[in-house]
Amino acid sequence: MKLEQVPTPAYVIDLAKLEANCRILQYVQEEAGCKVLLAQKAYSLYKTYPLISQYLSGTTASGLYEAKLAREEFPGEVHVFAPAFKDEDMEELLGITDHIVFNSERQLRKHGSRCREAGVSVGLRLNPQCSTQGDHALYDPCAPGSRFGVTIDKIPSDLLDLVDGLHFHTLCEQGADDLQTTLKAVEEQFGPYLHEVKWLNMGGGHHITREGYDVDLLISEIKRIRKTYNLEIYIEPGEAIALNAGYLATEVLDIVENGMEILVLDASATCHMPDVFEMPYRPPLRNGFESQEKAHTYRLSSNTCLTGDVIGDYSFENPVQIGDRLYFQDMAIYSFVKNNTFNGIGLPSLYLMDEQGDCSLLKAFGYQDFKGRLS
């Protein structure tokens, strides 16, 4: 079965592109002498973990469930960070994780000693108060009032007695130049501590596999930090692992005319690609162009009752007909990890596409998946 034959709606993962991304990340690991971890919050299709784990050193989790999934399905290190931990979750985490990073001094003092007794390496998240995000203020952990990380004025005096390593995460879909800027701020504020700890985790948001990313600068900065402070370095990209490695296949169910032609699809921004609203952004579409760029412009909408469930305006070289198929691109990341069944809309099936373009069904969803979440 080829992509054009897959029943819609469906997420289709391009295994060749996924592996190509992983090879780039493996190159960074080897050249920089660091460890690259998969941030599961962006991509957690665990049936592909055997492939990814051939290239990466482990995973990072945002809580108990992701940590359990990693320990069960992904060979390698398991790291965990959360703004706060429940006592019952911590009890289970101690048996399955290698690193736990705390967000505050209070959380560190509450759980840190238990972690060390269990053989878990302990870290503290820093807030270098260095904002480098121009278009993603919603995702800026260094924004005023952010709940993430400890600022330099809140560092506990006995920090080095409490932690093995330090962590920061300030980037979102950014380049190595922004990491370089952030590292300068981290060194200026926290440099004395870096000389004393064992490891530094530089977090995620590194768009390493994006075309034009300065991989050489990333490698040189990691090498510099390693040499200067004698540290083990971790980075934990999410999007970079599966960037441009997935499609959302959809069908045109109807065309409504109201000042313009509106396509009603069997895919939904609200249900199937919520980042359209949360970033917000306009997802790339195969053979689709900017509004008015080509001869035929349409508004792409969804089959829900939410008026604002609109994906965006696109133009096409040829008219679109009812029954035509459209393919949204870069749909492996922050898609099925965030989707939902609002309005009783079904979840898209999951397919894997091999190097020959043949697609195989991984999982199909139905009514019981909708009903099973309710009672």
Question: What spans do the regions from the language model cover?
Answer:
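Active-site-proximal beta-alpha core segment in soluble small-molecule metabolic enzymes
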Residues: 34-199, 221
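Acidic/histidine-enriched ion/cofactor-binding microenvironments in catalytic or ligand-binding pockets
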Residues: 188, 194-197, 217-228, 314-327
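N-terminal capping/small domains of soluble enzymes
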Residues: 2-75, 81-84, 268, 316-329, ...
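Glycine-rich beta-strand-to-loop/alpha-helix junction loops that act as flexible
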Residues: 39, 170-171, 200-209, 237-239
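Charged (often Lys/Glu-rich) extended helix/loop segments that serve as interaction or gating elements
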Residues: 221, 235-375
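Feature marks short, surface-exposed loop/turn motifs that line or immediately flank catalytic pockets
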Residues: 130-132, 172, 208, 241, ...
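Charged helix-capping and loop-helix junction motifs
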Residues: 180-185, 214-220, 250, 315
